[in-house]
A protein has these predicted regions:
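Terminal membrane-proximal soluble interaction domains of membrane-associated proteins
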Residues: 22-90
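A generic structural signal for short
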Residues: 15-16, 45
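A general structural motif
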Residues: 16-22
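N-terminal leader/presequence segments that are low-structure
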Residues: 1-15
Length: 91
């Protein structure tokens, strides 16, 4: 039986502001635990930012998740058990 704290964690959005590409593993662990992540990559150096984004894209898609780019530095990483309803997409 889950506790209230576990239920709250599972229904929460985790906001992450990684400082370097070494934090990739933390994001994959959270996605694997079905935690929705809002990630601001602006603290990662420009040199490493694209590499970090590519690594996370591969990992999230490998776990059957989805990614919504909010801006060029902010991303929503969506585990497989979440649905994305995006009113901003054109029909």
């Amino acid at each position: 039986k889950q506790t209230l704290k576990e239920d709250v964690i599972k229904n929460a959005v985790k906001v992450i502001n990684p400082k370097n590409i070494n934090e990739f593993g933390k994001i994959m662990e959270l996605i694997n635990q079905n935690i929705l992540i809002l990630c601001d990559t602006s603290s990662i150096t420009n040199k490493d930012q694209q590499r970090f984004i590519d690594m996370v894209y591969g990992g999230v898609y490998g776990l059957k998740g989805k990614i919504k780019e909010i801006s060029n530095k902010i991303f929503l990483y969506i585990p497989q058990n979440f649905d994305l309803i995006d009113d901003s997409e054109k029909s």
